[in-house]
Amino acid sequence: WYIASIYITLSLLVLELIRLSQRIKPWFPKWMKGHWQQTKLTLFFLIVFGVTGLMIHAYHTVMNPIVKNVYITLPKAAGDRDSLTIVMMSDLHIGEVIGKDLVQKYVALSNAQHPDMVVLAGDIMDYESRFAENAHIEDDLKQLKAPLGVYIVYGNHEYRANRNAKYRWLQKTGGTLLIDSVVQPDSTFYLIGRDDFIHKKRKSLHSLMEGVDTGKPII
């Protein structure tokens, strides 16, 4: 409902701007001015049906996740490794809508790819941590299978509400938190995880690169 209210408010704002422009410099066609009440009613239902359709589509998309394959060729050699399969998931927004069942579906999809490594790229939680805590969703994320590990970086939602509780909960998921830090999942490449831009004092990429062997692939 929060998202729907935003779209409805924006639509009404646009309509109000159109109405004001008509008062400044009339440009509505005669048929519209002659049937203004019917026009307003039509526009109202268009907004309601449009936002409803958009929300239904968004809900269907969230409830039926798909895997998108992206192939990237790196110019640097990674030892004897000729390929690396990474599952990247972002914006899970675990909360009132995204709960245990859907997270289990995400985990199953990830494991079906047989990845070498999994990266959770921010906004793991929507707002408060209590929904994930009460449902023990950390136990589901522990089921992510990847021989090189599971890595987690912050998004802006990790800084909302009870950020310390979120930090403690993320540590229970079995993943490695990368907050302005660098790791080597194995000896052939580096993985750099930056803090979210909302943290104004986050380290620069240049400082994180200090001590990194630039002859190896860096992700």
Regions found by a protein language model. Give the residues of each.
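Solvent-exposed, charged interface segments at domain starts and junctions
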Residues: 1-16, 103-117
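Alpha-helical transmembrane signal-anchor/signal-peptide segments
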Residues: 61-77
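Extended recognition/assembly regions associated with phosphoester-bond processing machinery
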Residues: 15, 19-22, 56-58, 70-73, ...
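Soluble catalytic domains of enzymes that build or remodel membrane lipids, polysaccharides, and related
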Residues: 73-219
